[in-house]
Amino acid sequence: MGFHTFDAAEADRLSDPTRFRFCSREELLQHLPTGDGTRLLDLGSGSGFYTDELAPHVGRVAALDVQRAMHGSYRDRGMPDNVDPITAEAGSLPFRDGTFDGIVSTMTFHESTTEGSIAEAARVLAEGGRFVAVDWSAA
C-alpha cells in the first residue's frame, strides 16, 4: 500500500453503513471460507468496517493496514477479540507461506496492487484458498 492513504483523522467516515450499497456482508461471505478454524487476511482493513462483518464467521482475522492510526481508530470503536491488527504493506506481508484460508480486499486493491503485492498475497494464501477483491469501478 502507500500510493494513497485515507486520512486517519477521518476514519469515522469509513463506518458509514451506506458503504454496504457497494458490497454487502452477504456478498463477501458467499465467496469466502468460513468456520471456527478459518483464518482470513483483510488487506487494507482501515477502521475495520468490513472486518467487523467477517469476524463473527471465522476463527481469526488479520486486519492489515499501512497506517497504525487506523488500528487505533478501530480499537477505539471496539475491535473484536478474534481480530489481530497488523501494520504492514501489502508488498511485504509478515506471515508464513500458506497462513490464510482467505484474503479479502475491499475498496483498497487499486491502492496496493503491484506485482510484489500480488505475489505476496499468493504466497500467504493456503492451497485452495480464496482471494476476494471488491473495488471501485469507473462504470
What are these regions (language model features)?
Residues 1-11:
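N-terminal, positively charged/glycine-rich alpha-helical extensions of SAM-dependent methyltransferases
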Residues 12-13, 18-19, 130-139:
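C-terminal alpha-helical "lid/dimerization" subdomain adjacent to the S-adenosyl-L-methionine
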Residues 101-115:
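A short SAM/SAH-binding and catalytic strip from SAM-dependent methyltransferases
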Residues 9-29, 33:
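Conserved SAM-binding loop and adjacent beta-strand
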Residues 91-102:
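A short acidic, Gly/Pro-enriched loop at the edge of an enzyme's catalytic core
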Residues 41, 46-92:
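Class I SAM-dependent methyltransferase SAM/SAH-binding core
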Residues 116-130:
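A short glycine-rich, Lys/Arg-flanked "PGG" loop and its adjoining helix->strand segment in the class I
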